[in-house]
Amino acid sequence: MSTHVAGLGLDKMKLGNPQSFLDQEEADDQQLLEPEAWKTYTERRNALREFLTSDLSPHLLKRHHARMQLLRKCSYYIEVLPKHLALGDQNPLVLPSALFQLIDPWKFQRMKKVGTAQTKIQLLLLGDLLEQLDHGRAELDALLRSPDPRPFLADWALVERRLADVSAVMDSFLTMMVPGRLHVKHRLVSDVSATKIPHIWLMLSTKMPVVFDRKASAAHQDWARLRWFVTIQPATSEQYELRFRLLDPRTQQECAQCGVIPVAACTFDVRNLLPNRSYKFTIKRAETSTLVYEPWRDSLTLHTKPEPLEGPALSHSV
């Protein structure tokens, strides 16, 4: 989106019949304004309406809020890439996996902490920018609904400045939606005597959250079947970590009804559960050395079925 909104291209706009945009209050205002002032008023008002229905529409803001909620559930990783790969070169001279052999482990751990901090700050800034967009739209929409013509005439410069500010916020928000490069102040490779070392870039990457399939997951009498999925399937298979625990254990022995299960698939059956009890399950990716931030994991509570009733046999008298 361009941040240039001065004039809003009003001299190039081909407006239809202005009367089609008028409500009764606007019709009353038309009687009070000179024809030239009225023309300027309607053109600027229509330009603002166009901005609020296209560049900053409620539907668009709703989509941004949904994307923001998704980003808060994603997992964030640090990627080590030679500069030519980070810039999009598809013919690697040095594979990323080989770079880890050259990197100082202690320095890499420090950079992971930097990646964690940068990710947290980025998410906080995105939330703040989205609030500014909500506030800016509400403010501009109130101007559009107001019968007062002054903001569109004598005070139009202030409105244009506000439009430019909101457009700049939108540009910053869209740019920050994509995780970027980590800023490295020092060399990650300690052994400078090694053969020619490529210029290394550290990038932040995002993985979509792991979510339980609530329709396919179910509890039976003494076992439960759990299924989960990732919105965008990874190119390679992933390892997961399934946790479970009994809610409200009543004895010391029942406190042992919990566990952590490594799983290499997207489904697993948890056995030896107690009947007629509630269990909480959580799912996440297995932790790797490149994970820097994972603020959320999906959880699901299931209730096992009770044991069948076993009563005395019924006798029938003739």
Swiss-Prot record:
Family matches, as SUPFAM superfamilies: Fibronectin type III
PROSITE patterns: FN3
Name of the protein: Fibronectin type III domain-containing protein 11
Occurrences of domain Fibronectin type-III (ranges): 210-307
UniProt-listed InterPro entries: DUF5581_C (IPR048317), DUF5581_N (IPR049231), FN3_dom (IPR003961), FN3_sf (IPR036116), FNDC11 (IPR039581)
